[in-house]
A protein has these predicted regions:
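Conserved nucleotide-binding/hydrolysis micro-motifs of P-loop NTPases
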Residues: 23-25, 45, 58-60, 88-90, ...
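Short, flexible loop/turn motifs enriched in small residues
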Residues: 30-37, 45-47
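Active-site beta-loop-alpha junctions of metal-dependent nucleic acid enzymes
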Residues: 54-76
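Conserved beta-strand -> loop -> alpha-helix junction used to position metal-binding or nucleic-acid-contacting
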Residues: 82-89, 94-130
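Acidic/histidine-rich catalytic cores and adjacent linkers
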Residues: 133-254
Length: 254
């Protein structure tokens, strides 16, 4: 059974939701193993960041994500327009199952790392520049055209595996283009949650390993609560009027 902890007790409308899994070491009967703590944060209708909750998922698979999303929805999470995260096993299917009205944005940073995994080290800087050029375009149409050119260029460089990863995965990294351009840099990656995870890892390194998943979850939630009470949660993250205008334009066009 998945254990969950809520950082906030009331529901609300959160247009942008960021999700990620952080792996911590658990000492289980003298044997060490990794346990995934699933974390969700969101930007509310007023443009402020909030930590929604965390859960122990034995592994980042579809069942864990579905359970986590259903729990969040059951606690009142509503109005979700976009979910940002890495393309881990089952994530996309879980989003479609629990939040069918929401779109999915694959984190571009994780996408780049995935392409780099099949790129010779000597070519990584060049390939990074090529990939960033795709996401620097001013429209989805232009980004798609640039991506096609990059794929051809990678093939010409004899980087067939990298070319295939770009060709197969680029579309799910361009969902942000359907939202206000003023928000693009903050909704195409889940860097906002990665920074929280780095803070958690710093704290957990002191502890070392945990006797069970629940103690790991409790420490993670304690750190998340702490961060949520700082300037991180008290400073406006984005102007949501841009989203309202975009949604109005879309409904008129529809």
């Amino acid at each position: 059974r998945q254990r969950q902890m809520c950082i906030r007790d009331r529901g609300g409308r959160y247009p942008y939701v960021y999700v990620d899994g952080i792996y911590l070491r658990r000492n289980w009967g003298g044997e060490f193993e990794n346990v995934a703590i699933l974390v969700a944060i969101a930007v509310n209708e007023d443009g402020y960041r909030e930590v929604l909750g965390a859960a122990e998922g034995m592994k980042e698979d579809k069942a864990s994500w579905v359970s986590f999303f259903q729990w969040l929805r059951g606690r009142g999470l509503d109005g979700v327009k976009l979910i940002v995260g890495d393309k881990c096993l089952g994530m996309l299917e879980a989003v479609g199952e629990v939040f069918p009205e929401a779109k999915y944005q694959r984190c571009t940073v994780h996408f780049y790392r995935n392409v780099f995994s099949v790129t010779p080290r000597s070519k990584v800087k060049l390939v990074a520049k090529m990939l960033k050029a795709i996401h620097a375009q001013e429209s989805k149409k232009a980004a798609r055209e640039k991506a096609k050119a990059v794929v051809e260029e990678l093939r010409a460089m004899k980087l067939k595996e990298a070319a295939k990863k770009v060709e197969d995965g680029i579309e799910e990294t361009l969902t942000y283009c359907d939202f206000p351009s003023e928000h693009w840099t903050r909704i195409r990656t889940n860097n906002v949650i990665e920074r929280l995870n780095r803070e958690i890892r710093r704290r957990t390194r002191v502890v070392g390993s945990f006797p069970d998943g629940n103690s790991a979850l409790m420490l993670v939630c304690a750190r998340l609560r702490h961060v949520a009470g700082t300037q991180w949660g008290n400073k406006k993250y984005m102007n949501m009027k841009h989203l309202e205008a975009t949604l109005e334009d879309t409904s008129i066009a529809g």
